[in-house]
Amino acid sequence: MGLHLTVPGLRRDGRGVQSNSHDTSSKTTADISRCPQHTDAGLQRAATPGISRLLGISSRSVTLTKPRSATRGNSRYHWVPAAAGWTVGVIATLSLLASVSPLIRWIIKVPREFINDYLFNFPDTNFAWSFVLALLAAALTARKRIAWLVLLANMVLAAVVNAAEIAAGGNTAAESFGENLGFAVHVVAIVVLVLGYREFWAKVRRGALFRAAAVWLAGAVVGIVASWGLVELFPGSLAPDERLGYAANRVVGFALADPDLFTGRPHVFLNAIFGLFGAFALIGAAIVLFLSQRADNALTGEDESAIRGLLDLYGKDDSLGYFATRRDKSVVFASSGRACITYRVEVGVCLASGDPVGDHRAWPQAVDAWLRLCQTYGWAPGVMGASSQGAQTYREAGLTALELGDEAILRPADFKLSGPEMRGVRQAVTRARRAGLTVRIRRHRDIAEDEMAQTITRADSWRDTETERGFSMALGRLGDPADSDCLLVEAIDPHNQVLAMLSLVPWGTTGVSLDLMRRSPQSPNGTIELMVSELALHAESLGITRISLNFAVFRAAFEQGAQLGAGPVARLWRGLLVFFSRWWQLETLYRSNMKYQPEWVPRYACYEDARVIPRVGVASVIAEGFLVLPFSRRNRVHTGHHPAVPERLAATGLLHHDGSAPDVSGLRQVGLTNGDGVERRLPEQVRVRFDKLEKLRSSGIDAFPVGRPPSHTVAQALAADHQASVSVSGRIMRIRNYGGVLFAQLRDWSGEMQVLLDNSRLDQGCAAEFNAATDLGDLVEMTGHMGASKTGTPSLIVSGWRLIGKCLRPLPNKWKGLLDPEARVRTRYLDLAVNAESRALITARSSVLRAVRETLFAKGFVEVETPILQQLHGGATARPFVTHINTYSMDLFLRIAPELYLKRLCVGGVERVFELGRAFRNEGVDFSHNPEFTLLEAYQAHAGYLEWIDGCRELIQNAAQAANGAPIAMRPRTDKGSDGTRHHLEPVDISGIWPVRTVHDAISEALGERIDADTGLTTLRKLCDAAGVPYRTQWDAGAVVLELYEHLVECRTEQPTFYIDFPTSVSPLTRPHRSKRGVAERWDLVAWGIELGTAYSELTDPVEQRRRLQEQSLLAAGGDPEAMELDEDFLQAMEYAMPPTGGLGMGIDRVVMLITGRSIRETLPFPLAKPH
């Protein structure tokens, strides 16, 4: 359905893939239209399978009705234009057929003569009349009011003639019947046309009637003179004095005069020629009469300036946005001026170019204005090159969307020439480089005028068409001073001769979009590939993050039809496209884009009704320049004369007559930005504070000044002597106004105090001014001396104050604070500002970290920092986070543990070393787990895991002492009483020696049945079944024991306990037990069901270490995301010998949880939270 119409219309600059036919397919590069945008989120494929779906096209069926503003309400006479058009169209068709076929003329002779005599002019043979009727029928269907007037006048005239004939009488019965019937038909037609007057609303150009008359008169005169000359040359039997009249009758009289009135006949072939002369005159006149396209189909300077302003504000997402500045387009704006649509009218189709330009929120208003314009002039709306978001907007306005293909988008950050998939491009680039080609990349503004003139000359000489092509995806002007930000990429040979060029227009501030591609016939193979690759590889230095290349029409059809197992319809459709590719190079374009491994982004065509698809296709072919109509204005210089900019925007004086971009800051001030109206949507309390801020600024008060240190903290001020002069800074938490005296509560990190403002004590101003300028939550600096209120409350007697930070949003409830736990996490800054308990928690965490460091420093440990970004994930069994480094084009992992790097330091001789830092594990989130956490790892040479039992206990007890003032842990407790349930924390003593138990003994006690390291797998599985513990069949005995431990021991432990001697198979980095077979020297510290830390006697045997890591790597290769990868660098370091070492790993977050009795989300300042 219209495929032959849409394909060529999407080419970019009027060329095929190659501009020199001698090149082979290996160096083809697309040079057609393109189109970007992001996702296909808004457009879902039609639910009902159709032929377009089977072929690989996604036809978007419309289920939404047009908004009321886009269509006129249907009246009972809405059918009149179509009925009139069809009636006249049938007569026109029969008249044309009768003019070319004597047989048809003989068959319809009787009804034709009856219609001609009594109903409607239906001459014997006359091309002119046939074509005029066809144009009249089309105009009637398009609801042109001038066509209604022409038809009505014809009916009235015919009715008057019939009425006169009836009144004259003397006719035969047959003639009387015909005249009466004709008169009745005319009266009915006149009544229907008058009643349907409002259905013919489409306008034509002003003065169309006079222009049409002038065209017809000129054409008729030329036709009569030419026909007279032919009659004189070939008179046949026609009398000399009747030749001029005969010619005039045939040319302009529609052969209405009976041929018998003339003496003789000219040669037969002349009648057809005479009719053509008349046809040309009448067709020209009719076209001018019914034409609704504006004469100035172009942008004015103000229009272009407004478009550039909208692009600066909103154009960062639209790769086709810059093409809206093409000057042979017209534009229609939303009433607000925040969005617009550029378009061109061809063959009665108003063809919109891509997405609306401007604020997405104003797109519906721009589409509505465009549809109203189409309706006013009777144009059929059509869209070429819409993005997914744009097509969704057009759908919501009542149009249908059809996916045409995909645009190739390159992401320079991901582009590389290495890899098997880039072999073709790499080889082409190598060939071009061997030929000595280099690439030069410059902005147009950096090119001298004479050099740009040479560039334009080269572009014209290398073009394989007479004129530039393009509409929706081409700029059509090279070297214009207004396009100084465009990018020129040139391929230069060793003799400094330019052999090829790419010109790209801006796509926002960080992208470029291909506009022009040219190459010399002498350019070597791979020239285009070299330019594209060099542009992508050097994009970062140019500030480019995305490159829009060419458009692949029906890409999905090529791709799906070539897949293994593709259905017969998909293969047939692909075969048809391959066949047509002989002329339109469709497959070549797809493959030339595909070789760069781009991101494919869909583009759409939109239309109102399936019946207008051919017209939309023809309009796109004409607009793109593939079909040039007679008297086309395509190659003329386009400068519009009638600005379309809304008066509100034009009146600002920001727009420029030369089309240059306006001042963006000025556009923001007149409300053309996303911030327009923000304050009107703010809550009332926030709006009041913004208003107060504006008043302060207008009074010359800086609400956010440069800071200066206060002389005292609040705590120090409260401890200062009476009458001591102090200055403090803090946040206002409460205000009590008693007229001349005002009390406020001021809080800083150290505490809270009362400040007293008395008019008699203030150096300047009064308390009322303070009350008017400040709100709760404001930051202020207070100066004065310490004293007391009448009630004896220690207070700062204020002599001067300064606002140092205006709080523009109200604080939470001053009594209850933030009660919602999720809100406390997401707005931790507010939680800390109003909640003393939260400030205590963050202080306790700091104390824990400091105590851990001080304890280790006291024992001679050295603190180091090891890489967080690692090439391999190892050191623990956990799922890692993956990121990517563009410089080396490789994946990296956020470390799950620093162990392997710390052991490298141990090999180097660092005997006591630790790291206190962040680790990352892509696992669950709950009360005790966060994907990002703080981990302590410490290693001590010449020690084992047993030495770390006392060391770990000492670290935790010292941390508790620092945070709580005693070696105690806080545990949640719930008491139920008469006044309800009360939740609180109670201290638990954790001083002294903590229990130590083996893993197998603890499990045996929980099961009531003895197990050890020699217990078989079958027995362990039976015990799991009996205890209800799940397991996997691929697990070995060690993994099953670990599962029993986690379900039966770890989760039931309360007091801090060390569980030692874990199975060897689940401890890949731990040395085997020195005396027990099947277990490793490892312990886990557990308290109240949470593992706090673990320690190993580290495995220092490099041979055994390699064997175990190879087992882990096999698991990783088999799909286990938590298994460690083989780290050859680490193993090589171990082969240089590491001393016997004991290692400790401890989760600092869990230690803080133990000491404070809080969850991990409460103890972390900013735990990971789900997005809203």
UniProtKB/Swiss-Prot annotation:
- InterPro entries in the record: Aa-tRNA-synt_II (IPR004364), aa-tRNA-synth_II (IPR006195), aa-tRNA-synth_II/BPL/LPL (IPR045864), LPG_synthase_C (IPR024320), Lys-tRNA-ligase_II (IPR002313), Lys-tRNA-ligase_II_N (IPR044136), Lys-tRNA-synth_II_C (IPR018149), NA-bd_OB-fold (IPR012340)
Q: Which domain of life is it from?
A: Bacteria
Q: Which UniProt keywords apply?
A: Aminoacyl-tRNA synthetase, Antibiotic resistance, ATP-binding, Cell membrane, DNA-binding, Ligase, Lipid metabolism, Magnesium, Membrane, Metal-binding, Multifunctional enzyme, Nucleotide-binding, Transferase, Transmembrane, Transmembrane helix
GO BP terms: lipid metabolic process; lysyl-tRNA aminoacylation; response to antibiotic
Q: What is its main location?
A: membrane
Q: How is the cofactor bound?
A: Binds 3 Mg(2+) ions per subunit.
Tell me the first and last residues of the signal peptide.
Answer: none
Task: Fetch the CDD domains from UniProt.
Answer: LysRS_N
Described function: Catalyzes the production of L-lysyl-tRNA(Lys)transfer and the transfer of a lysyl group from L-lysyl-tRNA(Lys) to membrane-bound phosphatidylglycerol (PG), which produces lysylphosphatidylglycerol (LPG), one of the components of the bacterial membrane with a positive net charge. LPG synthesis contributes to the resistance to cationic antimicrobial peptides (CAMPs) and likely protects M.tuberculosis against the CAMPs produced by competiting microorganisms (bacteriocins).
Name of protein? Lysylphosphatidylglycerol biosynthesis bifunctional protein LysX
Which organism was this protein described from? Mycobacterium bovis (strain BCG / Pasteur 1173P2)
